[in-house]
Amino acid sequence: MPIEIPTDLTPELVPFAWLLGTWEGNGFMGYGDAEQRAFRQRVTFEQTGLPFVIYRAQTTLLDEEGEPQREATYEQGFWELARPREDGDIGPGMLPPDPVPVLTSAEDVEKLRNADGGFDISVSILQPGGVAELYLGQIKGPRVDLRTDAVIRAQGAKEYQSGTRLYGLVNNHLMWAWDMAADGRELATHASAELTRIEPAAPSGS
């Protein structure tokens, strides 16, 4: 099925068009000696007209019958193309961007393709418990590969060293997998899920 691109989507977000909307589905999590648990997750990738995607994920544990048991965790962040920032971009702080986007056409965006034919991206994700991750990677068609470039932990936060995340669109389902290195262990499988889009991308400003 062709990927529908919202008519009001800023050119810089066209590579992310297949992710936009709200997704929901089930998966499994575990790590080290922790018991493997089934969960249900709702993920939203939202565009507002600015040149970044707002990401939110809500995870609920399931009981043995597959029914919701209790909330597990949330995370949220921002997905964007990795490129040098210009005077017309947002920031620093609350300083707004220029009314006209820095990248105004598909041709401008195409110039950012990397040697692999994809686009370099940066993804920042904030988790409860005092952990913030900065991922670098690429988006190439309906696939995203990410690896942590930096992890910030608040004093008293649980030990977490690094992570990798993989996202892909398979038969119109969003598949993702997360490996992590934590608690002094090597990078290993942590969680994965298969999600179905339940709401399409909302128009910017809605």
UniProtKB/Swiss-Prot annotation:
Heme b binds at H190. It catalyses: peroxynitrite = nitrate. SUPFAM superfamilies: Lipocalins (SSF50814). Keywords: Heme, Iron, Isomerase, Metal-binding. InterPro entries: Calycin, Nb(III)_bact/plant, Nitrobindin, THAP4-like_heme-bd. One of its GO terms (molecular function) is heme binding. The keyword Acyltransferase does not apply. Binds 1 heme b group per subunit, that coordinates a highly solvent-exposed Fe(III) atom. Its EC number is 5.99.-.-. A motif (GXWXGXG) lies at residues 21-27. Belongs to the nitrobindin family. Forms a 10-stranded antiparallel beta-barrel structure able to accommodate a hydrophobic ligand in its interior. In fact, this fold hosts the heme group, which is located in a wide surface cleft. Heme-binding protein able to scavenge peroxynitrite and to protect free L-tyrosine against peroxynitrite-mediated nitration, by acting as a peroxynitrite isomerase that converts peroxynitrite to nitrate. Therefore, this protein likely plays a role in peroxynitrite sensing and in the detoxification of reactive nitrogen and oxygen species (RNS and ROS, respectively). Is able to bind nitric oxide (NO) in vitro, but may act as a sensor of peroxynitrite levels in vivo. This is Peroxynitrite isomerase.
